[in-house]
Amino acid sequence: EDSRIRCLEQENRGVSSARNLGMRHASGRYLCFVDGDDFIDAAFLKHLLDASDRGASDLTVAGKLFCDRFPPDKIPALPTCGIFLRREFPLKNNLEFPEGIHPCEDGLFSHFVLALTEKISFCPEAVYHYRQHEQGNHHQIRKRTADILPMIPRWLSLIEEFYEQRHLWKRKAGHLVRFIEHEPFELRLLDMPFSPPEQEILYSIIRDFLNAHCTAAECRRASLHLPFRLLLKSSGFSDFGRRLRRAGKNTGIRRKLLHFCPVPSWRRNGRAQLRQVREQLEEIRRNITF
């Protein structure tokens, strides 16, 4: 036995309850979360500890995948496997994983952490091995559209409560908009096999929340992805579909105009970017029926 290791037991009340129990009983300087299906490299914790101590950070982003995914100042949320957290930070800010919420309990928790700190470090050397299989959470979640759709307003209600209590609506408006783009829009509306009526309901949920809480200036930010900007400009679900189709045609026209660009490297880069945008738009139109 190792005296540094403690085993805690409780009735199965979900992953949030288990993580919160662990946080309340932890005594070290840092918190790290590893799911039961996964495993970590031998040097995983050492890399994270060194990076966190060097940066005196509240949160360290773990792994190259997550370090590369977002610009340093524009991370809307992270999965628990991408989080290495100074233990005192959630304690002094009264932060816990939201219980009774699944999926997105980790997204909400990390979003709240990121909203409250600028002291973030990055550790691409930390290697986390994530197992994917048919019975895994990710695959099961994609099949449960009827359960997840009514869960999304609960996410937004928790966000409203958090931003209201901490007076963050103005100061962290951009952070909030990027979360809405990432979680309910990209990961749910665009990626999950909702039925057409469910897609229209989710579209309305997203638009109503943004109209209520986010300024037009934040919603026009160029850093937002094109499909999300099209949603923000649309007047309804059908109009969103028309804008997607029009954007796909426009990328084809722009690609032809690049033929007249005199700089070969600009021409190649422009074509690659337009190809990527067009493929993304085509995939969205295949997934969503307007």
Range-by-range predicted roles:
Residues 176-187:
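Amphipathic alpha-helical repeat scaffolds of TPR domains
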Residues 154-161, 182, 255, 272, ...:
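Generic structural signal for well-ordered, non-membrane alpha-helices
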Residues 82-85, 90-91, 185, 203, ...:
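Short, contiguous, well-ordered secondary-structure segments
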Residues 192-290:
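Membrane-interface aromatic/basic loop that binds lipid-linked glycans or pyrophosphate carriers
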Residues 162-166, 187-194:
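Secondary-structure edge/capping motif, primarily at the C-terminal ends of alpha-helices
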Residues 1-157, 161-169, 261, 267-268:
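Nucleotide-sugar donor-binding/catalytic module of glycosyltransferases
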Residues 168-177:
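All-alpha amphipathic helical-bundle segments outside canonical DNA-binding/catalytic cores
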